[in-house]
């Protein structure tokens, strides 16, 4: 969905510049729950859309015994994920390829389950992402997504500003459900609790537990990231990054921004 660059570097951009591995709110507990609602079982074929460094894809293969394909727009991420799968001894069951989530490079009906973890709202055309997810899942198969969700009462201007600061586009739960329906999904379900609790937004590190806002990066990581921001955006970029962080945490703590899990089926042929 279209955003402007008024608030660069966004939250998403700062995490990218930090070079650390982060995952979605709720951490691996959310990934485990996604596997549960999809009823994953050994031998099933799963597509992880916007697979990043491959952490979740490897988890699905290990935890549920499924065959996993991952697709990501970044060739660097694809290389990193492929190396991680090889180190995990799963190169024969977890494979990655470069591709756009708005034009997924697989044939229709290829997968039993298609998941997208916190990356539907990043591309400009989120509807195209959902359309493609429904296209490549088999008839009767399951699609799973989890995404940031507006909560409470916000004006359109507030939503636009927060989305620009965040670097992704949250929607109201009813809007995500409507978009899944337009893509052809049926039997749509949503789960907001416990995923919308503020503490879930700090659980984005795979290497350690984060218990409070502002502690996602360590002091050393913050200093290193600030230097990278300054090189690209100047001192104004550092000020903007702190401003965005404060606005983001305030929205979470005030209950304006939440997180939800959605799952649905493609109708059987």
Per-range role (PLM):
Residues 169-184:
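Short alpha-helix
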Residues 127-142:
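A short glycine-rich, Lys/Arg-flanked "PGG" loop and its adjoining helix->strand segment in the class I
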Residues 191-269:
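Conserved Class I S-adenosyl-L-methionine
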Residues 47, 53-103:
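Class I SAM-dependent methyltransferase SAM/SAH-binding core
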Residues 102-113:
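A short acidic, Gly/Pro-enriched loop at the edge of an enzyme's catalytic core
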Residues 113-125:
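A short SAM/SAH-binding and catalytic strip from SAM-dependent methyltransferases
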Residues 148-168:
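Short, glycine-/aromatic-enriched active-site segment of Class I SAM-dependent methyltransferases
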Residues 24-42:
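Conserved alpha-helix/loop element of class I SAM-dependent methyltransferases that forms part
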């Amino acid at each position: 969905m279209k955003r402007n660059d008024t608030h660069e570097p966004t939250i998403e951009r700062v995490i990218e510049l930090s070079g650390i591995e982060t995952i979605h709110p709720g951490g691996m507990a959310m990934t485990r729950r996604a596997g549960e609602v999809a009823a994953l079982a050994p031998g099933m074929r799963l597509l992880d859309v916007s697979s990043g460094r491959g952490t979740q894809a490897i988890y699905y293969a290990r935890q549920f015994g499924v065959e996993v394909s991952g697709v990501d727009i970044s060739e660097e991420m694809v290389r990193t994920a492929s190396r991680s799968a090889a180190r995990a001894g799963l190169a024969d069951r977890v494979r990655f390829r470069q591709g756009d989530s708005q034009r997924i490079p697989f044939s229709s009906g290829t997968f039993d389950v298609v998941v997208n973890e916190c990356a539907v709202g990043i591309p400009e055309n989120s509807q195209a992402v959902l359309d493609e997810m429904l296209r490549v899942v088999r008839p009767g198969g399951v699609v799973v997504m989890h995404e940031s969700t507006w909560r409470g009462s916000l004006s359109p201007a507030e939503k636009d500003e927060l989305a620009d600061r965040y670097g992704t586009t949250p929607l109201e739960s009813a809007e995500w459900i409507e978009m899944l329906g337009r893509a052809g999904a049926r039997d749509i379900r949503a789960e907001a609790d416990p995923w919308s609790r503020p503490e879930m937004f700090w659980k984005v590190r795979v290497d350690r537990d984060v218990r409070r806002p502002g502690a996602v990066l360590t002091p050393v990581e913050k200093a290193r990231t600030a230097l990278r921001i300054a090189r690209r955006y100047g001192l104004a970029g550092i000020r903007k990054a702190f401003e965005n962080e404060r606005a983001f945490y305030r929205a979470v703590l005030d209950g304006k921004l939440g997180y939800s899990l959605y799952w649905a089926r493609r109708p059987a042929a």
